[in-house]
């Protein structure tokens, strides 16, 4: 496939771009003017795919600008690109070289194009991100409170904890209002809440962390969450399966659902107990998390509420994990 690819190495202030030959190469500012130049370069050179490296959020503006202009753009993990460079023998590293390597990676692997979500879904994702930041800051303050030894510090820390609690309540209210103002998000939330052990708060987190829910198959959604089992085999050696990467905060939410489900969800309780007969506890929990996610994905895809009979039927049909 001779797809013409442009790689972009994203920095805080600048964007370095290159095609796989290095003939189309340069630097623009990471702002509106720079985006216009990039779009002109894409048009003049008949670029079919633009590939960006994830860069701690600095890539978001150019990503949304290109996707909003119907340009096919993909975002990839820096680790994968760096491993690709090493495999190709490209050990030197500069911004221009990185842009060319990203283009070559895109040409070889044809990454899945970014799907532009609705404005409200993007807002929900950003509110979810801010919520995580506040929780992290509150945990840090509580740790400081435990080792505080003077009255002034203790008083200051308690004020900060109170502030974070108020901000979290405000963020939760904003997320709820956003969901209720969007018919699709509200309907999805109601479908998720039909599952025993998923309440409004958990549904809110799942919607924020996984807007792709319902648009992928079961293997893709498990991989997205980092719940797809990885093999570690070689010759006669067969290692334990493991999970890695993926969306940590989505996994955290699913973990709490599975733990709560031991009391409130008959399907999860039965599945966990059956798996526990042959597998360690954590392995059984992860397997339940993966199965739960695929069930939720199917519910959103098929526009159906939780059905215990259907879930148990799937469990019987897939008795061997």
Positions of the model-derived regions?
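Short alpha-helical scaffolding segments that buttress acidic/His motifs in well-ordered protein cores
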Residues: 105, 192, 206, 253-258, ...
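Phosphate-backbone recognition surface of nucleic-acid-processing proteins
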Residues: 200, 204-281, 317-318
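Short helix-capping/linker segments at secondary-structure and domain boundaries
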Residues: 109-114, 211-215, 261-267, 294-308
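Low-complexity, acidic/Ser/Thr- and charged residue-rich accessory regions of DNA metabolism proteins
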Residues: 235-236, 240, 271-321
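Helix-hairpin-helix/helix-loop-helix acidic hairpins
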Residues: 145-201, 210, 265
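Phosphate- and other anionic-substrate recognition elements at nucleic-acid/protein interfaces
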Residues: 1-155, 159-165
């Amino acid at each position: 496939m001779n797809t013409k690819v442009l790689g972009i190495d994203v920095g805080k202030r600048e964007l370095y771009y290159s095609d796989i030959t290095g003939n189309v190469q340069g630097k623009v500012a990471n702002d509106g003017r720079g985006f216009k130049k990039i779009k002109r370069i894409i048009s003049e050179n008949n670029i079919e795919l633009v590939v960006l490296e994830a860069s701690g959020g600095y890539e978001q503006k150019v990503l949304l600008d290109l996707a909003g202009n119907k340009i096919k753009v993909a975002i990839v993990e820096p680790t994968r690109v760096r491993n690709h460079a090493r495999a190709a023998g490209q050990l030197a590293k500069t911004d221009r070289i990185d842009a060319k390597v990203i283009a070559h990676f895109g040409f070889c692997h044809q990454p899945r194009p970014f799907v532009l979500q609705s404005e409200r879904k993007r807002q929900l994702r950003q509110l979810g991100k801010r919520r995580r930041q506040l929780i992290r800051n509150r945990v840090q303050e509580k740790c400081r409170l435990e080792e505080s030894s003077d009255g002034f510090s203790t008083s200051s820390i308690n004020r900060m904890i109170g502030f974070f609690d108020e901000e979290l309540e405000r963020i939760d209210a904003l997320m709820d209002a956003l969901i209720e103002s969007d018919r699709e998000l509200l309907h999805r939330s109601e479908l998720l809440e039909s599952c025993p052990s998923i309440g409004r708060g958990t549904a809110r987190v799942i919607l924020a962390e996984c807007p792709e829910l319902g648009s992928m198959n079961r293997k893709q959604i498990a991989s997205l969450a980092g719940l797809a089992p990885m093999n570690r085999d070689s010759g006669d050696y067969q290692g334990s399966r493991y999970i890695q990467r993926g969306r940590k905060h989505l996994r955290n939410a699913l973990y709490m659902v599975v733990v709560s489900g031991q009391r409130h969800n008959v399907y999860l309780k039965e599945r966990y107990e059956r798996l526990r007969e042959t597998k360690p506890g954590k392995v059984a929990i992860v397997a339940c998390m993966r199965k739960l996610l695929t069930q939720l994905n199917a519910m959103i895809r098929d526009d159906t509420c939780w059905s215990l009979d259907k879930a148990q039927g799937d469990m019987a049909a897939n008795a061997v994990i």
